[in-house]
């Protein structure tokens, strides 16, 4: 099982920019989304890395992400969410538990919002392989993971 340093945990929790090490700034998401507010966010302006906060709070959903990581998180959620939403696992909690075992990460740090690029890529591959194995007729596009 992977163990994390205090610095790595601070990055995964959105307290430190993973690209430059600076402390991110709390803003309203309207600044990013052309005037439409979806709540609070943390941003590192020099790196153009940001993360949204849990609804109604100032708690980041995970690590700050640049454009590449934001896209990988979207792709990881697209394939991972199928696993729990279509009941291939009993629920979201069980799906994350399965993923934590596959990635050999502590459960508390197995959330797509906390992942870096490598972990997102591994999640995408693992989930595609799992779905293809469970239902190859429904997921033929995932034959290669």
Give the role of each language-model region.
Residues 109-129:
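Chromatin/DNA-recognition segments of nuclear transcriptional regulators
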Residues 85, 89, 108, 133-137:
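Intrinsically disordered or highly flexible coil/loop and linker segments, enriched in small
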Residues 130-145:
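Long C-terminal interaction/binding lobes of large macromolecular proteins
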Residues 57-98:
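Extended interfacial segments that mediate partner engagement and assembly in macromolecular machines
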Residues 90-97, 101-115:
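Short, surface-exposed acidic
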Residues 1-58:
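N-terminal cysteine/histidine-rich coordination modules
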Residues 12, 39, 71, 94, ...:
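Short, well-structured alpha-helical interface segments that form or flank functional binding sites
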């Amino acid at each position: 099982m992977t163990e994390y340093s205090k610095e790595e945990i601070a990055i995964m929790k959105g307290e430190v920019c993973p690209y430059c090490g600076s402390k991110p700034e709390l803003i309203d998401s309207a600044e990013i989304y052309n005037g439409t507010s979806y709540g609070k966010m943390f941003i590192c302006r020099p790196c153009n890395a940001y993360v949204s906060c849990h609804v109604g709070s100032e708690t980041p959903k995970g690590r700050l992400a640049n454009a590449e990581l934001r896209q990988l998180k979207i792709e990881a959620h697209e394939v991972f969410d199928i696993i729990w939403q279509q009941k291939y696992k009993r629920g979201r909690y069980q799906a994350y538990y399965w993923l934590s075992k596959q990635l050999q990460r502590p459960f508390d740090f197995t959330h797509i919002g906390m992942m870096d690029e490598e972990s997102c890529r591994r999640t995408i591959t693992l989930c595609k392989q799992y779905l293809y194995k469970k239902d190859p007729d429904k997921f033929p596009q995932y034959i290669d993971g």
